[in-house]
Curated annotation (Swiss-Prot):
It comes from Danio rerio (Zebrafish). Homdimer. Interacts with ATG7; this interaction forms an E1-E2 complex that is essential for the transfer of GABARAP thioester from ATG7 to ATG3 and disrupts interaction with the E3 enzyme complex. Interacts with ATG12; this interaction is ATG7-dependent, essential for phosphatidylethanolamine (PE)-conjugated ATG8-like proteins formation and also mediates the autoconjugation of ATG12 on ATG3. Interacts with the E3 enzyme complex composed of 4 sets of ATG12-ATG5 and ATG16L1 (400 kDa); this interaction disrupts interaction with ATG7 and promotes ATG8-like proteins lipidation. Residues 137-165 are annotated as: Disordered. E2 conjugating enzyme that catalyzes the covalent conjugation of the C-terminal Gly of ATG8-like proteins (GABARAP, GABARAPL1, GABARAPL2 or MAP1LC3A) to the amino group of phosphatidylethanolamine (PE)-containing lipids in the membrane resulting in membrane-bound ATG8-like proteins which is one of the key steps in the development of autophagic isolation membranes during autophagosome formation. Cycles back and forth between binding to ATG7 for loading with the ATG8-like proteins and binding to E3 enzyme, composed of ATG12, ATG5 and ATG16L1 to promote ATG8-like proteins lipidation. This is Ubiquitin-like-conjugating enzyme ATG3. The gene is atg3.
Length: 317
């Protein structure tokens, strides 16, 4: 029944998006929405700092006229997913995630409650040295090591050592080597039997601009160790159960042919971003629109906690 409701909603929103005029004037600070031009600027900033992300054009027949032909959406491939969400349900790791998001589900609450009070903790890592200099600890999508960030070497986050030890930060390539991850899975299985099998999956992640909601929108499609497409039910295993079929639905990518993908619905993105902007302002800082996608990738982590695109980065604004 929920799938039928989602299908009807998707069709209605598709018509609404077609009829919605393109946002021309910036309303980022006031409402948390962005124009197509601001989306491109934020995307350029993401690609610059995180070379695993790149711009793509998609099918020519599906090009959106309000975006440059070669910058229709953002893409990162082969992002690892080492375990299923159910394996986190009663783990210390999940407790940390819940604690990080204010004990009430954080960003999850923004989809089930009328307010967005819980999202304040989503920017807990933002610290203000002074009104003109803001050091931000931002978790971003599969960021590779970039030589132009001198500040990255100072004051690394507590979990950076774990990432370095895992070897996930040893490559600057735009994609991860899935064959190595598959070999690792086999080694684990041989060493510890069935219980030790590392069920590695990989995901391709996409960020599009939603003209109706005037915000970015995240899409994802998964593969098993042999690079065979996952079923819908299998992909749902890697998504927080608080969001399956509610915040996350199966829809067709606006720029690509089938199959359909999982999509994080953007109905509350602007509301969350507005709260973050206000939180930063209360601390004496100012959040630039070019940082939008870096922040966006942080707060959607609550939806896909097992997909490992969160490499901690430090940025100074």
């Amino acid at each position: 029944m929920q799938n039928v409701i989602n299908s009807v909603k998707g069709t209605a929103l598709g018509v609404a998006e077609f009829l919605t005029p393109v946002l021309k004037e910036s309303k980022f600070k006031e409402t948390g929405v962005i124009t197509p031009e601001e989306f491109v600027a934020a995307g350029d900033h993401l690609v610059h700092h995180c070379p695993t992300w790149k711009w793509a054009s998609g099918e020519e027949a599906k090009v959106k006229p309000y975006l440059p032909n070669d910058k229709q959406f953002l893409l990162t491939r082969n992002v690892p997913c080492y375990k299923r969400c159910k394996q986190m349900e009663y783990s210390d790791e999940l407790e940390a995630i819940i604690e990080e998001d204010d004990g009430d589900g954080g960003w999850v609450d923004t989809f089930h409650n009328s307010g967005v009070t819980g999202v304040t903790e989503a920017v807990r890592e933002i610290s203000l040295d002074n009104k003109d200099n803001m050091n931000m600890n931002v978790k971003t999508g599969a960021c590779g090591n970039s030589g132009d960030d001198d500040d990255d070497e100072e004051g690394e986050a507590a979990d950076m050592e774990e990432y370095e030890e895992s070897g996930l930060l040893e490559t600057d390539d735009a994609t991860l080597d899935t064959s190595k991850m598959a070999d690792l899975s086999k080694t684990k299985a041989e060493a510890g039997g069935e219980d030790a099998i590392l069920q590695t999956r990989t995901y391709d992640l996409y960020i599009t601009y939603d003209k109706y909601y005037q915000t970015p929108r995240l899409w994802l499609f998964g593969y098993d160790e042999d690079r065979q497409p996952l079923t819908v039910d299998q992909m749902y295993e890697d998504i927080s159960q608080d969001h399956v079929k509610k915040t996350v639905t199966i829809e067709n990518h606006p720029n690509l042919p089938p199959p359909a993908m999982c999509s994080v619905h953007p109905c509350r993105h602007a509301e969350v971003m507005k709260k973050i902007i206000e939180t930063v302002a209360e601390g004496g800082g100012e959040l630039g629109v070019h940082m939008y996608l870096l922040i966006f990738l942080k707060f959607v982590q609550a939806v896909i906690p097992t997909i490992e695109y969160d490499y901690t980065r430090h940025f100074t604004m």
